[in-house]
A protein has these predicted regions:
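Conserved ATP-binding subdomain of kinase catalytic cores across diverse folds
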Residues: 28-131, 140, 151-162, 166-167, ...
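C-lobe/activation-segment region of protein kinase-like
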Residues: 185-243, 386, 399-438
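Short, solvent-exposed loop/turn segments at secondary-structure boundaries
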Residues: 75-78, 197-199, 312, 363-366, ...
Length: 438
């Protein structure tokens, strides 16, 4: 998508949130247009959407969302824009008591009544970071992490009691600021529906969606979250735990089918690949020459990749493995980032981007100290449908220093498969076997 021009902001029709003075908004938009013309840094870009960091004061203090409708279907261009809907929903959610940074204003640029672009000006929360990034950086202290888990449970309950059904109920849509007093905000109301207080089935679905993104969360962390959600009622928290676990297999089956379909069709992220006797699928941000070179035995760039040989696979089974690898990486990082799955007469190979310090578990001399991390990771994999007997050391990767565990062979997972009875005990037994203590 082409970035919006400063003149587009002036030509758009703007609707401010309640309480914003139109004259003050006009002055704000003038400064936003000037900032966009000179230093509108693009934070995120896709085919129809861009996100710009805008400095209206000292430092970046606003985000400008821009959506392009010029190639959208006709009926969609006649309707109200996404930005207008998000402003209305965020304002309504805030009125129902949900803490959220309400957008300042929404703008629509139309030509002859047809929507061309829409804009949303959103204030930034100073010092706040989204939970996805917070988890990835792993820089917060245990006390802060526990406080964040409880705050997330309390906010989720507050949203559901207020009738806020957020389709993308995920860690990246929550902002956390640890500065006293610590606070949590909900953001991104583009895919929100407002209802009466949510039914138990709707709550279970949303909690299961959130839980699948928290692949490396321990059982204690999940229980702290559910206790806060259940208002410290331990019996109610256990019931929620069981209901969420029962819903998870259906979500996993749907995810696997969706990612297999997405990753095996040409798009802005994926493309078919055929090179030097290899054919399959790859991410567009991967270097085809480097991938083929590593598979053919060249050592150039080898340190950047991690290769898992899967033996001879039919095209259908290879597509399943490729989709599973994408799902496991996207859903909380249970696998490293998969770059390509390629087949040749030698067999099939899955190529990952090597995480920092990652080695195959069976190559590490001292595995005993990894037993606690193994138990947590294996518990999650068993819940995703992994077969306990198939979880061997050569199918797992580990960071020798950080203790992070990754699955390297996605075919040991069958999404939708019921986890074994006493899954915690089985995970601990597998961890002890792999660490050499059992």
């Amino acid at each position: 998508m082409a970035a919006p021009r400063a003149g587009d902001l002036a030509a758009a029709r703007w609707v401010p949130r309640e309480g914003v003075d139109p004259a003050a908004l006009a002055a704000l938009l003038e400064r936003a247009a000037a900032a966009l013309a000179t230093e509108g840094a693009v934070r995120k870009a896709s085919r129809r959407k861009t996100l710009h960091a805008i400095a209206l004061g000292d430092g970046v203090d606003h985000l400008l969302k821009a959506n392009d409708y010029r190639d959208a279907p006709l009926l969609r261009r006649l309707r109200r824009s996404r930005s207008a809907r998000e402003l209305a929903r965020a304002s309504a959610a805030a009125a129902r008591g949900v803490p959220t940074p309400v957008p300042v204003a929404a703008g629509e640029l139309r030509r002859r009544g047809l929507l061309e672009r829409c804009f949303l000006l959103v204030p930034l929360v100073p010092g706040a970071v989204d939970l996805e990034r917070l988890r990835a950086e792993r820089a917060h202290a245990p006390r802060e992490r526990r406080a964040c888990e409880r705050a997330l449970g309390a906010l989720a309950r507050r949203m559901h009691d207020a009738g806020v059904f957020q389709e993308d109920f995920a860690p990246n849509n929550f902002l956390w600021r640890a500065d006293p007093p610590p606070r949590l905000w909900a953001i991104d109301f583009e895919r929100v529906r407002l209802r009466a207080p949510l039914s138990r089935a709707a709550r279970t679905l949303l909690l299961a969606r959130l839980e699948r993104r928290l692949a490396d969360a321990s059982g204690a962390a999940r229980m702290r979250f559910l206790l806060a959600y259940a208002d410290e009622d331990r019996a109610a928290a256990r019931r929620w735990w069981l209901e969420v676990e029962a819903r998870a297999p259906r979500l996993a089956r749907r995810d696997r089918r969706r990612w297999q379909r997405t990753a095996t069709h040409p798009s802005r992220r994926f493309a078919p690949m055929e090179r030097a006797g290899w054919r399959g699928w790859a991410r567009r941000d991967a270097d085809p020459a480097a991938l083929a070179g590593v598979l053919d035995g060249e050592r150039v760039g080898e340190a950047a990749f991690l290769v898992r040989w899967l033996g001879r696979l039919s095209r259908r089974r290879a597509a399943r493995a490729w989709g599973l690898a994408q799902m496991l990486w996207q859903r909380g990082g249970a696998s490293p980032k998969p770059l390509a799955l390629l087949r040749s007469s030698r067999g099939a190979a899955l190529v990952f981007e090597r995480p920092s310090g990652c080695q195959r578990l069976d190559t590490l001399a001292d595995r005993r100290r990894l037993e606690p991390q193994l138990a947590i990771a294996l518990d999650r994999l068993l819940r995703l449908g992994a077969r306990p007997e198939a979880l061997t050391a050569d199918r797992l990767g580990a960071a020798a220093q950080g203790g992070r565990i990754w699955l390297l062979d996605p075919l040991v997972v069958s999404p939708g498969r019921r986890p074994p009875v006493e899954v915690h005990r089985r995970a601990r037994e597998c961890a002890a076997r792999l660490a050499g203590t059992g």
